[in-house]
Amino acid sequence: MKAKEIIEFIETFAPKDLAIEGDNIGLQVGDNLDKEIKKLGIALDPSLSVIKKAEKEGVDFLFTHHPLLKDPIRNFTGVIYKKLKILMENDIILYSAHTNLDICKNGLNDALAELYNLENPKPLYDNGLGRVGIFKGSFEEFLEITKKYIHKNPIVVKSKEVDDNFKLAVLSGYGLSQSSIKYVAEKADVYLSGDLTHHSKILAEELGLVVVDATHYSTEVFGLKKFKEFLSSNLDLEIISLDF
């Protein structure tokens, strides 16, 4: 299967125009899109360890959720040089789908909404990020699901008692900033995401929003595993996971 055919398939599932402005999605490294791909590796991050593993495993197309470069850089030295050197010397194509994969139908946020069987789920933000709906059950049942499928030891900021059948917001990855806490406090009773800070915790307590930090990694990898299964069932090539 050619690299360009894989990219076309991914972009049909997670259209690039869904990505939020400034998100560095799409082809990251590589130029021969007519190359025949024999093994695809999938990972959350294009870390040096992931790229080294891709080389070791004979991966020739590396898909990552997070892009290789987020901010503009002025030179290619240190770790970024090491990453590029391995990718280019081994002719490994690197491709990323980030917020477009978060937002798209059956993407990472829909995977969380489906896990909790949210009633009437809708996008949490106008740009399509996150999901919010009614969780039909108790807070304890919600935590049991979280611990079983997402993270065994989530951080729970229980700012108030939660009635059954509560409004639950979910957002895969980084969602527990102070601005997000303030926004979601007007939308939901409970908020599951990742990357809680000390000041966000205090703000959640003050606003009466129950927050569950199941980590950036775990809230995204749950849906990424589903995406890997989807690719495996639709693409005629070997697909392996590299960091989950």
From Swiss-Prot:
A divalent metal cation 1 binds at H65, D102, E220. Pfam families: DUF34_NIF3. Keywords: DNA-binding, Metal-binding. Gene3D superfamilies: NIF3 (NGG1p interacting factor 3)-like. InterPro entries: DUF34/NIF3, DUF34/NIF3_sf. GO terms for cellular component: cytoplasm. SUPFAM superfamilies: NIF3 (NGG1p interacting factor 3)-like (SSF102705). GO terms for molecular function: DNA binding; metal ion binding. A divalent metal cation 2 binds at H66, H216, E220. Homohexamer; trimer of dimers, that forms a hollow cage-like architecture. NCBIfam families: YbgI_SA1388. PANTHER family: GTP CYCLOHYDROLASE 1 TYPE 2 HOMOLOG, NGG1 INTERACTING FACTOR 3. Belongs to the GTP cyclohydrolase I type 2/NIF3 family. DNA-binding protein exhibiting the ability to bind to both single-stranded and double-stranded DNA. This is GTP cyclohydrolase 1 type 2 homolog. It comes from Methanocaldococcus jannaschii (strain ATCC 43067 / DSM 2661 / JAL-1 / JCM 10045 / NBRC 100440). The lineage of its organism: Archaea, Methanobacteriati, Methanobacteriota, Methanomada group, Methanococci.
